[in-house]
Amino acid sequence: MARLFGTDGVRGVANADLTAELALALASAAVEEVADRGTPPPGPVDGVPVARSAHGIDHRPLVVVGRDTRPSGEFLEAAVVAGLARAGADVTRIGVVPTPAVSYVVAATGADLGVMLSASHNPMPDNGIKLFAAGGLKLPDDVEDAIERRMAGPAARRPVAAAVGRVRDDSMLVDGYVDHLLATLPGGPGGLRGLRVVVDCAQGAASDLAPRVLRAAGADVIALHADGDGLRINDRSGATHLDSLRDAVVAHGADAGIAHDGDADRCLAVDSAGEIVDGDQILALCALALAERGELERGTVVVTVMSNLGFHHAMRDAGIDVVTTPVGDRYVLEAMRSGAYSLGGEQSGHVVFLRHAGTGDGLLTALQILGRMAETSQPLHELAKAMTRLPQVLVNVRGVDRARAETSDELRAAVADAEAELAGAGRVLLRPSGTEPLVRVMVEAPTDELARDVAGRLADVVQRALR
């Protein structure tokens, strides 16, 4: 049986793969596993006080639940809440919020578990369930595996009478998240006065909060795709479709553009000329800023195997060490925690500032980018020169057996030939997706033409060898 949890929770087409029955069963199993473990939380995110003990023999588990704007989120939330309450957990619903808001509220309230209903950047028919442990960190793999075993085992004895969980709504808890974000801004609240910013909310979870936070920080804000229309979430908008943001930044004469995905755990940017500033460039400029302030713990940044070689060269030249992990912000976070590092992230725009958040936070990242612009009086295109990108081509090969990607002799030989052709001046990476049925072919080379040529040939081999 395939593992239920992927690299970022459970995902699938809502009401087909991800059903109400599955959501209910998963929620109950998660509460039972967390309650039985009774493990103390790793502590709150720095600066986030724990307001409630999460432990004790007679303790009733507390769970925080949020969702994005997808229509399917409504019935899935109902199923999740039912599963939590029938297992004896008290539930606090905080409404439509970014994923990192759930992480923050879990830490701030001392909750035992957090549940976010979102499929992030995936299209509208999909949805997902992300789980956060006490302290606001994502559940480790071994806990997810234990939850799956519970789901496959005999039903647990259910509480009755006064022992069943209670449910309440408290969207006001999100105000604390907003205050927390503003407190991280270099220069303090109001520090973005004089900056005009276009923010693309992808019709997702940030549709209300992103413009609100930026305005509270003093920016002149033009909100794009911010109606909260879940039927159009991520539809030609947000962090995976930057064309409309690029056009809007130029049309409005804005200093910068900010793009979030459906659950706002990622952030990409656009400079005043409409040029894209990706996650690697954001990490580079933030690393230099933190190093300058003496806040880059152990002089190290954590990235994934997808980060551009140009990033590694820039950090080397700046005297900053780089730790590399598999793809997935959970693995970045694990490396950051184990090494006591303060900054890490992915090229896709997941950036983790561990002094302020327990997960990637798009709104927090936007404030750090814009705050650096205000702090230095430099335009974004100048700050983005913190690194020079090597041409990189990414090809998604669909309709193949991704499970065989690491065992195919034909594919292994093709990769070896490509690496020999690049002769150390570039690199090749083949990676089965952890969230979608495809294999990604990534090639970096001294020229765009060579990168495209090598990537195209490798993609053909993947299609032939793995079909």
Curated annotation (Swiss-Prot):
Modification after translation, per record: Activated by phosphorylation.
EC numbers on record: 5.4.2.10
UniProt GO BP: carbohydrate metabolic process; peptidoglycan biosynthetic process; UDP-N-acetylglucosamine biosynthetic process
Residues annotated with Phosphoserine modification: S120
Any one GO CC term of the record: cytosol
InterPro entries: A-D-PHexomutase_a/b/a-I, A-D-PHexomutase_a/b/a-I/II/III, A-D-PHexomutase_a/b/a-II, A-D-PHexomutase_a/b/a-III, A-D-PHexomutase_C, A-D-PHexomutase_C_sf, A-D-PHexomutase_CS, Alpha-D-phosphohexomutase_SF
Residues that hold Mg(2+) according to the record: S120, D261, D263, D265
One Gene Ontology MF term: phosphoglucosamine mutase activity
Entry keyword set: Isomerase, Magnesium, Metal-binding, Phosphoprotein
Catalytic activity, as annotated: alpha-D-glucosamine 1-phosphate = D-glucosamine 6-phosphate
Top-level EC class as recorded in UniProt: isomerase
Alphabetized CDD domains for the sequence: GlmM
Gene3D superfamilies: Alpha-D-Glucose-1,6-Bisphosphate, subunit A, domain 3 (3.40.120.10), Alpha-D-phosphohexomutase, C-terminal domain (3.30.310.50)
One Pfam family in the UniProt entry: PGM_PMM_IV
Catalytic residues (UniProt): S120
Keyword Isomerase: yes
Note on how the cofactor is bound: Binds 1 Mg(2+) ion per subunit.
Cofactor needs: Mg(2+)
Family in the record: Belongs to the phosphohexose mutase family.
HAMAP family from the UniProt entry: GlmM_B
The protein's role, per its UniProt record: Catalyzes the conversion of glucosamine-6-phosphate to glucosamine-1-phosphate.
Protein name: Phosphoglucosamine mutase
Species of origin: Parafrankia sp. (strain EAN1pec)
Source taxonomy: Bacteria, Bacillati, Actinomycetota, Actinomycetes, Frankiales
